[in-house]
Amino acid sequence: MTEHVNSYYAASANKHAPYPTLTEQLECDVCVIGAGYTGLSSALHLAEKGYRVVVLEAARVGFGASGRNGGQIVNSYSRDIDTIEANCPPDQARLLGSMLFEGGQIIRERIKRYNIQCDLQEGGVFAAETEKQLHELKSQYARWQKWGNDQLELLDAKGVREVVASDRYVGALLDKSGGHIHPLNLALGEAEAIRIQGGLIFEQSAVTSITPGQPALVKTAKGAVKARFVVVAGNAYLGNLVPELASKSMPCGTQVIATEVLGEERARSLLPQNYCLEDCNYLLDYYRTSGDHRLLYGGGVVYGARDPADIERLIIPKMLKTFPQLADVKVEYTWTGNFLLTLSRLPQFGRIGPNIYYMQGYSGHGVTCTHLAGKLLSEVLSGQAERFDAFAKLPHYPFPGGRLFRIPFTAAGAAWYTLRDRLGV
C-alpha cells in the first residue's frame, strides 16, 4: 500500500480513520479521480449540491502536493494578471481577474463551516531582495487593488524587518488576505466534510482505465464506477492515465524541511506577526512557522519529479542565508513533493469529450487555485460554464524538446532566470 511520506505534516496529522478500498461496482453522478485539493474541492461542492459523488484515490487523501506543500494561502495565479490582460480578450481577462482572490475565500469558508482544525493563520508577505523586485511588487500592489484586494500594504526596508528578522530584504508587499494552514489537515477535514455530505471516498484505489460513454466507466484493480460525469484531478500524480494531458505539463519537485520545535518565543523572534513569507526570485524560497512553533522552510525545484539526493544539503543553506541565527537548530523532517508545471504557468482546465473534465497545472499556486477549480467545476456541471470556460480558453503549448529533452530545456531556462535573480537584472 502507498502511504503518506515521512513529513512533518504526516507526523502531526489529525486523527482519522482510513477510507476503504473500492472492491465493488458502483453507479454515481460524478466520479472524481484524485483526493487532493482539486478532487476534494470538486467533490465537496458537488455533494453540497446534492450530486452522488465517488472519489477514487490511488494512495491516501492528500498524498501528493496537497499534503506536502508549504501551506501558504497565496492569492492570484502563478502568472501575473497583467500578462493575462495583455494576451486575452477583454471579457475573458475581466472574468479571470474577478476570480483572483476567490480561492482563499473558499478555503476560509470551508474551515469555518466544517470546523476544520488546520492551524489557520492570517497574512502573507512577498519579500523583495532587490530594488527591481520591489518595483515589481509596487506594480503588483496597484494591479491587485484594481481587482478588489484592499488588504494590501507596501513595506520599506524598515517595515519588512518588523515582520521578518532578516537583513535579506529591501522591502515587501504584505497581503493580509493571504495566510497559511496545515495542508494535510485541511485535506483530511475536507474529506470528512464530503463524507458528511453523503459522498464516498475510496483510498488505495488507483484508476486503471477510463472508458468514455454515457455513462463513463472508471475501473480500478478491484472495482468499477459508472458515472454521468468524470473529473480527472490527479495533477502531478496522474501518470499516463490520460496521455493527451502529459505533453502540456511537467511534474516538478520542491523540497521542504521542518526544524525541531523552537518554542513560541524563538519562533516569534523570526516572524513576529506569524505571517508566511515567500521571496520574489524565479526559484523562490518560502517559509513559515508551524502550529507547534517549528520553522518550515522550502525552496528549489527539481524538474522531472526526481527526488533530490540530499534535501538538507539543498535547503539548509537557504534557511541560514535568511536566518543565520538558526545555525544551532536541528532539522527533524525533510521531504519532497511534486507539483505540475505548465509552460504558460497558468492552470489547464478543459473537457475530454462531453462528460469528462480535467483541472490541473497550477504551477506552484495550487492551494488557492485548486479550491477555485472545484467550485467552477460544480458550476459547469450545473449548467453555468462561463467561469470554467474562461480558464478552458487559455492557450497551452507542449514543452520544447518533447518528453526526452523537455527537462534539460526547462532546467536551462530556470538556470538563466536564477542567474538574473542573482545579478539583480
Range-by-range predicted roles:
Residues 1-30:
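Extreme N-terminal leader/targeting segments of oxidoreductases
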Residues 2-12, 79-85, 106-123, 128-189:
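Flavin (FAD/FMN) cofactor-binding and adjacent substrate-gating region
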Residues 28-55:
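N-terminal Rossmann-like FAD-binding beta1-loop-alpha1 element of flavoenzymes
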Residues 48-68:
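Glycine-rich FAD pyrophosphate-binding loop
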Residues 105, 113-121, 207-209, 224-354:
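Active-site substrate-recognition segment that forms the wall
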Residues 139-143, 168-228:
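Helical element adjacent to the flavin cofactor pocket in flavoenzyme catalytic cores
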Residues 305-307, 312-422:
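C-terminal catalytic lobe of FAD-dependent flavoproteins
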